[in-house]
């Protein structure tokens, strides 16, 4: 049976087109997906991301568990509220999921994981946690909103009680804090996002969600669907699990080597394989592509390089660049001239370093 967020009726009242996304009925757009995309780049938009899975980890051995569970080093988290992006790997070095972990107390950490991997992630985390006597708690009582764009932080901060505004305004990137709403309910506000823009992601009690959503709409924040969320994240060079990487792909094959910490004395799951890949290299790589000709890059299209064939992982029309962009997995080595097979034509594309766009600005290498 398809799941619905607390905002389902609200989305429908706003004219949203609803689609099945990982078993959840979610808004794909409220009208023009391109207009929604531009509004986030230029102003502020709000996303219902309550389909995401929130998992709290409790116990005195949470940090040792996470040193084992995550490819990135949780030892970087020393200040309560700080967050870290990491992959969770299987013994073969494949990505079970990518996630954000928050350090709240030494005996209390929080995960935000993908909706599509909920059951798999919970099973894997519970299995690993049992040896550390860590309690795993799914927080289905919480909803999640993302407010993104250059005006997003100001719009959210203005709705808070004055006693909290200063702390929220000073919140650093990849950090979170808890504040009280006007009805004295706890809001968990983090300066994170999936768009390449500044902004906040907010966890809050289900019953508070509609009130906050409507309050933000009254300030001029626009509702944004998952369609624009996808084009925004692709412009920002952010991976989508299940499309850009999965359990058959290691972080080094998904342009996520920067999230791997081979720190001394930490035997995380999959480390042996990643050490070999670090030393010997990998046979595949993920690259960014930009197409100057008219057309759109799509998942699954064949990519031809000097080193052999690959395929498009994520592809879309970029509203900011007014060109087609994409990620591709291709054989390792210098790709040289690259072409994409579109309707039996080998169309030339350029290899570019991503992100393509960050905080509204086209990155300098894109049109070199």
UniProtKB/Swiss-Prot annotation:
Catalytic activity from the UniProt record: N(6)-[(R)-S(8)-aminomethyldihydrolipoyl]-L-lysyl-[protein] + (6S)-5,6,7,8-tetrahydrofolate = N(6)-[(R)-dihydrolipoyl]-L-lysyl-[protein] + (6R)-5,10-methylene-5,6,7,8-tetrahydrofolate + NH4(+)
BP-aspect Gene Ontology terms: glycine decarboxylation via glycine cleavage system
Domain of life of the native organism: Bacteria
Entry annotated with the keyword 4Fe-4S: no
InterPro entries (UniProt xref): GCS_T, GCS_T_bac, GCST_C, GCV_T_N, GcvT/YgfZ/DmdA, GcvT/YgfZ_C, TrmE/GcvT_dom1
One GO MF term: aminomethyltransferase activity
The keyword Disulfide bond appears for this protein: no
Keyword terms: Aminotransferase, Transferase
EC number in record: 2.1.2.10
TM segment ranges: none
GO (cellular component) term, any one: cytosol
Protein family per UniProt: Belongs to the GcvT family.
Quaternary data: The glycine cleavage system is composed of four proteins: P, T, L and H.
NCBIfam families: gcvT (TIGR00528), PRK00389.1 (NF001567)
Function: The glycine cleavage system catalyzes the degradation of glycine.
Entry protein name: Aminomethyltransferase
